[in-house]
C-alpha cells in the first residue's frame, strides 16, 4: 500500500470516528429526550422523539448548507459566485496588516471584557465558595471535603490563582490574561496549520463570537489555564518539540480532565511535516511524562483514584448534556456537522485537517468518558472551550486555499 493510500485510510478512519460523535451530539439537539428515555433513570413521562426547540432550524440550515456545499464541490454554482468564493478562500493579508487587524480585534475584545474583572465572582458562581476555601488552605492544608481537596491537587492552577489573588489583588486578572492568550494561540495554530494569516483571523473571529468562551473568559473558578497550556503544547510540536510535553504536564496539573488529550497531541505530531526522528522523540518524551504523572496520581496523596466508578449508561447521556450546555452557541450547533464533513475533503491537501478532526473528536468524547468512569464529576460548559477553539480553527481551514490549488 502506497503512502498516499495509507494517508487516505487514516483520514477516512478519523472522519468516521468524528462523524459518529458529532451525529450523537446533533441527535440530542433534534430529539432532546431520546437518550434519557432509553438510558436514563426517569423515563416514564418522556417522549423520545419529541422535537427540540432548535430541531427544525438545525435541520433546515444543514440542508441548505449541504446543498450549497455539494453544488460548489461539483462546480454547479454560477461562475460569478464561484469566482467570489475562490477569491475569498485564496485571499491573504500581509504581515503588517495582519498585526493591525489582530490588534484591533483583541483591543475590542479586551475593552469589552475588562469591566467583568470588577464583578465579585462569589455572586456569580456557587462553586467559588469551594475555590475560596481551597485557597485558604493552600498550599499545605488538607480538607475532608473531596471538592476542596480536588482543587488543591491541581497544583499549577492553584499557584497561578494564588498569585493573581495575592499579588495582583484580583483573582480574575491571570485567568483573563490566559483567555487572551488562548485567542492568540488560536491564531498562531491556525496560521501554522494553514500557512495563511487570513485563516487565523477568521478563526479568532469565530472563537470570539462563541457564547461559552465569552461566558468563562474572566472566571477564576472555571479558568482557561489548562486550555492555554494544551494549545501551547500543540503549537510547539513544530517549533520547539521538547517544550510540548512540558506544557502538556502543566495543563495536566492545572486540570486532570486534559489527561487523555495527549493522544490527540501524538496524532497531531504524526500528521505534522516533521522528521520521523522528531516524531519518535516526541512519542518517547510523552511516554515518560505520562508514566511519571500516573505514578504521582496513584502512589501520591491525590483524590483521583478514589473517584473512579464505572457507569456505562452515563456515557450516552453525556452527549445529551453536551448539546444542552452548548445550546446558546448557535453558530457551532449549525456548523459542526458541515465542518466535520468539509474537513475530510480538505484533508486531501492538508493533513492537519485530520488533526483538527481528531481534536474535535477528543474534545467531544472526553466529557462522556469522564462521567462514565467517575462519580465525582459532571459535564460543565466551560470544559468545551477547547472544542470551540478547534472548531474555530476548522472554520479557518476553509479559508486556507492556495492560489496554486
Question: PLM features: what roles do these ranges have?
Answer:
Residues 114-136, 140-160:
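Extracytoplasmic catalytic/substrate-binding loops of multi-pass membrane glycan-assembly enzymes
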Residues 151, 155-184, 216:
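Loop-to-helix entry region of an early transmembrane alpha helix in multi-pass inner-membrane enzymes
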Residues 182-187, 331-355:
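Hydrophobic, aromatic-rich transmembrane alpha-helices
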Residues 186-209, 227-228:
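Transmembrane-helix signature of polytopic, membrane-embedded enzymes
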Residues 214-223:
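Short acidic/glycine- and proline-prone juxtamembrane loop motifs at membrane-interface regions
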Residues 230-243:
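Membrane-interface transmembrane helices that cradle and orient dolichyl/undecaprenyl
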Residues 242-267:
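Membrane-interface alpha helices of multi-pass inner-membrane proteins
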Residues 260-289:
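Perimembrane helix-loop-helix junctions
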Amino acid at each position: 500500500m502506497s503512502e498516499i493510500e495509507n494517508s487516505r485510510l487514516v483520514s477516512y478512519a478519523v472522519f468516521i470516528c468524528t462523524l459518529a460523535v458529532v451525529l450523537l451530539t446533533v441527535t440530542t439537539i433534534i430529539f432532546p429526550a431520546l437518550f434519557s428515555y432509553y438510558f436514563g433513570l426517569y423515563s416514564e413521562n418522556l417522549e423520545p422523539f419529541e422535537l427540540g426547540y432548535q430541531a427544525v432550524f438545525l435541520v433546515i440550515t444543514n440542508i441548505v448548507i449541504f446543498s450549497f456545499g455539494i453544488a460548489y464541490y461539483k462546480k454547479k454554482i454560477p461562475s460569478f459566485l464561484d469566482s467570489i468564493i475562490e477569491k475569498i478562500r485564496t485571499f491573504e493579508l500581509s504581515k503588517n496588516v495582519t498585526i493591525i487587524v489582530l490588534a484591533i480585534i483583541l483591543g475590542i475584545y479586551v475593552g469589552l471584557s475588562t469591566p467583568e474583572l470588577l464583578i465579585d465572582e462569589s455572586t456569580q458562581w456557587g462553586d467559588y465558595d469551594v475555590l475560596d476555601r481551597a485557597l485558604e488552605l493552600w498550599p499545605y492544608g488538607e480538607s475532608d471535603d473531596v471538592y476542596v481537596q480536588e482543587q488543591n491537587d491541581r497544583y499549577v492552577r492553584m499557584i497561578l490563582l494564588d498569585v493573581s489573588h495575592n499579588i495582583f489583588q484580583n483573582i480574575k486578572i491571570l485567568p483573563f490574561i490566559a483567555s487572551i492568550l488562548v485567542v492568540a494561540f488560536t491564531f498562531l495554530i491556525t496560521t501554522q496549520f494553514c500557512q495563511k494569516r487570513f485563516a487565523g483571523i477568521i478563526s479568532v473571529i469565530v472563537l470570539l463570537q462563541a457564547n461559552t468562551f465569552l461566558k468563562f473568559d474572566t472566571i477564576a473558578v472555571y479558568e482557561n489555564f489548562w486550555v492555554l497550556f494544551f494549545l501551547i503544547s500543540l503549537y510547539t510540536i513544530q517549533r520547539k518539540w521538547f517544550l510540548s510535553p512540558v506544557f502538556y504536564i502543566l495543563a495536566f496539573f492545572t486540570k486532570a480532565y486534559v489527561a487523555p488529550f495527549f493522544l490527540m497531541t501524538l496524532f497531531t505530531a504524526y500528521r505534522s511535516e516533521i522528521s520521523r526522528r522528531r516524531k519518535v522523540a516526541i512519542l518517547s518524551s510523552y511516554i515518560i511524562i505520562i508514566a511519571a504523572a500516573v505514578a504521582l496520581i496513584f502512589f501520591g496523596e491525590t483524590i483521583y483514584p478514589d473517584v473512579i466508578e464505572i457507569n456505562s449508561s452515563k456515557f450516552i447521556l453525556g452527549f445529551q448534556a453536551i448539546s444542552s450546555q452548548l445550546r446558546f452557541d448557535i453558530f457551532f450547533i449549525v456548523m459542526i456537522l458541515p465542518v466535520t464533513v468539509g474537513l475530510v475533503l480538505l484533508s486531501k491537501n492538508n493533513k492537519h485537517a485530520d488533526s483538527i478532526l481528531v481534536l474535535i473528536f477528543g474534545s467531544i468524547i472526553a466529557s462522556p468518558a469522564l462521567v462514565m468512569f467517575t462519580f465525582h464529576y459532571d459535564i460543565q460548559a466551560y470544559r468545551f472551550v477547547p472544542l470551540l477553539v478547534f472548531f474555530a480553527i476548522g472554520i479557518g481551514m476553509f479559508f486556507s486555499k492556495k492560489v496554486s490549488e
